[in-house]
Amino acid sequence: MNTNKDQEERKYPLNQIYFYLTEGCNLRCRHCWIAPKFQEKGCSYPVLAVDLFKSIVEQAKTLGLSGVKLTGGEPLMHPDISKILDYINNQDLNLYIETNGVICTPEIAQQIASCKNPFVSLSLDAADAEKHEWVRGVNGCFESALKGVKNLVNAGVKPQIIMCIMRRNKDEIEGIVRLAESLGAGSVKFNILQPTVRGEQMHKKGETLTIEELVELGAWVENSLSDSTDLRLFYDHPAAFRPMSKMFGDSGNGCSTCGVLGILGVLADGSYALCGIGMSVPDLVFGEASTDLLKDVWETTDVLNELRSGLTDRLEGICGDCLMKNFCLGSCIAQNYYKNKNLWAPFWYCEEAGKVGLFPETRMRPTVG
């Protein structure tokens, strides 16, 4: 006979772990929502031990694990990245990687390609070196990133190019699409700069776009620019702003929402957290992999259980009234908590759009009376 706990485990499997493998990064991106330490030659910062990585994966497989995301910091800087990739391959896990591409060698690219269903997101913030390197903070990183893309494509992996939109590079959007086409990438995603950690400072300095500009750009990307390319384009605004045809049906890309109820983060120091936000928000760190059983963390952490029972009924403000909330789940719980210290707070983008009359009325719950 199945117990209630067995049923609960099936209802909320641990689908994916986000491994933040390194505290250091070889770039110093001005918009980063995590703000890792810049790792120059001659200095080093903590990385996740390989044995601990393996132990976590072994425990997670009994909870439903099907894939892992390697991110950072910069995951390819991990001194044992080759061993980690081999282990993922041997465990038959789906592989997702977020990288700046700068040190993606042909050998590493081939290892990535040998894994199950590899998906690589690689950051390029402009189609020219000057603007990209202004964003990323290191001279020469543009050409190195291009080599990384080419190495992946040559190995048989078509990466997704990710561009973070800000005032300095807003005119580079179409250029990035054309560059991605020429490089043989698989898709392009346009991220909205979040007001978190370094990004928060950029918002305060006026280096980001207004909500009016962001909404207008999203409509242009999805309704016009996307028709000019065979690449799939993703503009990362909440589901309420996306045309139904872009989410559903044969040509739809899905809702592109966070799977917050089925993921867990592991930081470079071995801490369990909601995701990388644990580097900045201690409230969202749940335990230590070296001492706490993953099963206990997954099943008994108050925050995780609150999210399971509260999403989406407890969402507040405009998110609580949105017809897309069961798909969107508040867009980014980590961002909402960082800004408001409240799991149920509305997402800033939707809130700002609502204030200026740009939140789609057709996606709002009808008022009675």
Report each predicted region and the residues it spans.
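Radical SAM enzyme [4Fe-4S]-AdoMet core and its adjacent flexible, acidic
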Residues: S114, S123-D125, E130-D292
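Conserved alpha-helical substructure of the radical SAM core
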Residues: M1-F119
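Short beta->alpha junction loops/turns
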Residues: T22, E74, G101-V102, D125, ...
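Accessory C-terminal segments flanking Radical SAM cores
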Residues: P238-L358
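Short Fe-S-cluster ligation motifs
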Residues: S55-G72, L307, A345-G369
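Residue-level signal for the nucleotide or nucleotide-sugar donor/cofactor binding architecture
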Residues: L48, P79, G140, R168-D171, ...
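Residues that line or immediately flank small-molecule/substrate-binding pockets and catalytic motifs
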Residues: P36, G72, L124, I192, ...
